Amino acid sequence: MAPVEHVVADAGAFLRDAALQDIGKNIYTIREVVTEIRDKATRRRLAVLPYELRFKEPLPEYVRLVTEFSKKTGDYPSLSATDIQVLALTYQLEAEFVGVSHLKQEPQKVKVSSSIQHPETPLHISGFHLPSKPKPPQETEKGHPACEPENLEFSSFMFWRNPLPNIDHELQELLIDRGEDIPSDEEEEENGFEDRRDDSDDDGGGWITPSNIKQIQQELEQCDVPEDVRVGCVTTDFAMQNVLLQMGLHVLAVNGMLIREARSYILRCHGCFKTTSDMSRVFCSHCGNKTLKKVSVTVSDDGTLHMHFSRNPKVLNPRGLRYSLPTPKGGKYAINPHLTEDQRFPQLRLSRKARQKTNVFAPDYVAGVSPFVENDISSRSATLQVRDSSLGAGRRRLNPNASRRKFVKKR
């Protein structure tokens, strides 16, 4: 495995204790990645690295480009500011040493086209026979009348078919003609018990045992790098890997944690089951409720859209919803939860004293007044900590179990 010339490392590479000196020649990262690491063991390893760790900040234009691209792929809500900077640094190094002609500027969009097959009439399902038209019942031949079974233990299965012929007698005659011994029933039971015992003793080669666990870990820690790769990113974040793959950048795997394919995501409402590709929405565009969940989708060759749902029950976790909603309050400074998109809120504006600005060139400026803006601490808006009208309806705390600030700075 030839080492990559330039490698950008994420926090997951340091937490997994990856041998980056064997993966790449020049190791890059940003200072925010090192700041994220809090455990003592990893910090001790960072203090005595066997290679030179280079800190480099990405340019703002690449940060803006990666941010817009991640919004189109649907991974933007899953990425932190540090993750976006790591992606931007990888894009910047690729542009400096390789070029951007082979990189994608737009992700692969999910397009739904008309399908030849009707979705309500599935075809070619394994294990099922779906006739197009009901066939008339066929009459039973007179020459072969159905024989009634002698043993009625399995009568429910024998009603609709003739009993299968027993070929044990014919097999015994063939063995007698060849001169072979016919095993008795007791010998067959003993042989079967021995075979089962041998099968149970065989542990197989695919099991992980204390003797081979170190070898398996060494194989998993190997990083499969394709040839002719000059810039790559080592990360264990699947959202970052998805963005890198869709942009055309190289992802270096650590401990075998690598996504198989790039997926696109949409938002699906679990209330009205409508979907939207606008990943920046908070409320459903059809019913207006806050019931949107991210779902990965793939498109087949015939244009059929397949949505992949998670079996994890935490996806639709009702935590914090067991409490009843508070009674809606009226007035200008009421704090009501934001439940629907078209819910109206009063305009929370600052007081006049807080909105006073000093402009000596204004025609209505009164001389002699203090040129300093007064700090409003007595009005009700200042008491309720209303900072700006863009905040909407103030503190809309939906979950009573959410963490709160215990220590408030006194005025």
UniProtKB/Swiss-Prot annotation:
It is found in: Nucleus. The keyword Repeat does not apply. InterPro entries: NOB1, Nob1_euk, NOB1_Zf-like_sf, NOB1_Zn-bd, PIN_dom, Ribonuclease_PIN, WRNPLPNID. Zn(2+) binds at residues 269, 272, 284, 287. It holds the Pfam family Zn_ribbon_NOB1. It comes from the Eukaryota. A zinc finger (NOB1) spans 259-331. GO terms for biological process: maturation of SSU-rRNA; visual perception. Residues 5-108 form the PINc domain. GO terms for molecular function: RNA endonuclease activity; zinc ion binding. Residues 120-148, 181-208 are annotated as: Disordered. Residues 182-192 have a biased composition (Acidic residues). May play a role in mRNA degradation. Endonuclease required for processing of 20S pre-rRNA precursor and biogenesis of 40S ribosomal subunits. Belongs to the NOB1 family. May interact with UPF2. Component of the small ribosomal subunit, ribosomal RNA processing complex (SSU RRP complex). This is RNA-binding protein NOB1. The lineage of its organism: Eukaryota, Metazoa, Chordata, Craniata, Vertebrata.
